[in-house]
A protein has these predicted regions:
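Active-site donor-nucleotide binding/catalytic segment of nucleotide-sugar enzymes
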Residues: 279-308, 313-315, 328-332, 437
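Histidine-anchored nucleotide/phosphate-binding helix
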Residues: 9-27, 146, 303-318
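Long, C-terminal catalytic modules of enzymes
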Residues: 402-446
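Catalytic donor nucleotide-activated moiety binding site of glycosyltransferases and closely related
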Residues: 312-356
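A donor-sugar binding/catalytic signature common to diverse glycosyltransferases
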Residues: 134-135, 141, 160, 357-404
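Conserved N-terminal ligand/cofactor-binding loop architecture of enzyme catalytic domains
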Residues: 22-118, 161-259, 263-264
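Conserved nucleotide-sugar donor-interacting segment of glycosyltransferase catalytic cores
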Residues: 119-181
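Nucleotide-activated donor-dependent transferases that construct or modify glycoconjugates
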Residues: 1-13, 35-37, 106, 133, ...
Length: 446
């Protein structure tokens, strides 16, 4: 009997490690692991006895110093072989674009890194594993390996949070159900909107995220300890991990001081210029900003990363009697909010108003006429509050008749008008929530 091979992608959160520990007690398979962690964490994985991995690859050990003599022919054939757009992933990589405040990568450096990554992954896949088990990708190289696995016949089993708190899903693609039943094929529990809203409150993911954000915001001890450890430890990581290029101690400390000041100034600006009370005297469409940088745009919706342009497109597409309300993402506080110039440009658009992050999303959903989102769960929450939604990227709840998956920006004016006339049926939402519960498990990823 052939022993199946399973590859785990471990990014330092121990999720894949603990899952492998549990799985090895139940099945007889060969376990392999790609470990994507900084240098100082390698020792733990080298000495751990939780899982008997047949082989471990430390991701950054496979990446050499960037060089100028890049094998473009290899990268060209790689793209064709795996149907992967490398520049799409590379230019949306937070380490390679404007979100990296410490180092600006050149074209040659990026191509050199891509070449090393792709060649390393091909060598690993030569083992012909049957499964990839991993948390959803955050960085471009993780997503490249995920896509390579699918093309190579390796079945991905990807952990991601459900939109229901304390539950997670295991699917081939994050936020895309493997269960392809339509709404018409599903069973309803005959819940009305009041019952659905009570159910949603019971499993409200926003509260779980909010608790995590508050903990990160208020807890100073871990930050102080991390800062002291950084100051008094050696800093060799900037030499052998491209994610830390440019992170000298002087730059890091200077960046910390500057961003703390910016955070306060930005918060003061929002307090002064954002609406804290919803003015519903005129009907409005609601667009929540996405936290950035995050995979929800950079990977899941890669052509919609410019949210200001998206807001302008929506504003241009509204019926004359409607306004657009835009709300800052509360978790953006963990990124020191956004540049004031970002907010100023939005406020300069006639018929657009920014809502303060402290306003509850539920209160907005009760008063808006339509929700438009690039990605994320707010479109489902809109349906629970009897409101139609438009979404710019693939998400499992787009099977709801009240949710329109936008295929082209040119169709936005027509779709907005059509969606404003769309009625949400409780039976459809009820069926979908049953489907979601069937396809998720009790497990807190946070």
């Amino acid at each position: 009997m052939v022993t199946e091979k399973i590859i785990f992608w471990e990014s330092g959160n121990f999720l894949s490690l603990f899952f492998a520990n549990s799985l090895q007690k139940k099945i007889n398979s060969e376990f392999y692991a790609i470990i994507d962690v900084p240098e100082r964490q390698k020792l733990f994985y080298q000495k751990q006895k939780l899982v008997d991995f047949k082989k471990i690859w430390f991701f950054h050990d496979g990446i050499s110093k960037p060089r100028k003599n890049v094998d473009i022919d290899f990268l060209t054939s790689f793209e064709e072989k795996y149907n992967i757009n490398l520049w799409l992933l590379a230019l949306n990589e937070r380490l390679f674009n404007e979100y990296n405040e410490f180092y600006k990568f050149s074209r040659e450096e990026i191509l050199s890194i891509l070449e090393d990554e792709c060649k390393m992954f091909e060598k690993i896949l030569a083992l012909k594993p049957k499964f990839l088990i991993s948390y959803k990708s955050t960085f471009h190289h993780h997503e490249i390996f995920h896509q390579m696995c699918k093309i190579s016949g390796v079945k991905p089993l990807i952990f991601s949070a459900s939109v229901l708190a304390n539950r997670c899903m295991i699917t081939e693609e994050p936020n895309i159900l493997d269960d392809k039943r339509t709404i018409e094929e599903l069973q309803s529990s005959n819940r009305d909107f009041n019952a659905l809203q009570k159910y949603w409150k019971k499993f409200e993911l926003r509260k779980q995220f909010g608790d995590t954000t508050d903990t990160l915001r208020k807890s100073k001890t871990p930050k102080i300890n991390a800062g002291l450890d950084f100051v008094f430890s050696s800093n060799t990581i900037i030499e052998n991990n491209y994610g830390y290029y440019g992170h000298t101690k002087r730059k890091a400390l200077s960046n910390y001081v500057v961003t703390r000041m910016k955070k306060k100034n930005r918060n003061d600006y929002m307090d002064k210029n954002f609406l804290k009370v919803i003015d519903d005297s005129t009907p409005f469409v609601y667009f929540p900003l996405h936290q950035m940088p995050e995979r929800e745009l950079l990977i899941a919706s890669p052509f919609n990363t410019n949210q200001i342009e998206t807001i302008k497109h929506i504003a241009k597409s509204l019926p004359i009697g409607y306004r657009l309300f835009v709300k800052e993402h509360p978790s953006q506080v963990t990124r020191e909010w956004r540049d004031i110039s970002f907010y100023e440009e939005i406020l300069s658009i006639p018929n657009v108003q920014l809502l303060h992050y402290s306003i509850k999303s539920e209160d907005i959903l009760k008063k808006c006429s339509l929700v438009i989102t690039i990605h994320g769960a707010v479109g489902l929450e809109a349906a629970i509050h009897k409101k139609p939604a438009i979404i710019f990227s693939d998400f499992f709840y787009s099977i709801l008749p009240s949710v329109h998956r936008l295929q082209s920006i040119e169709e936005l004016p027509r779709v907005i008008r059509s969606s404003l006339r769309t009625k949400v049926h409780a039976s459809d939402v009820d069926k979908f929530l049953n489907l979601l519960e069937e396809n998720s498990i009790d497990f807190d990823l946070f």
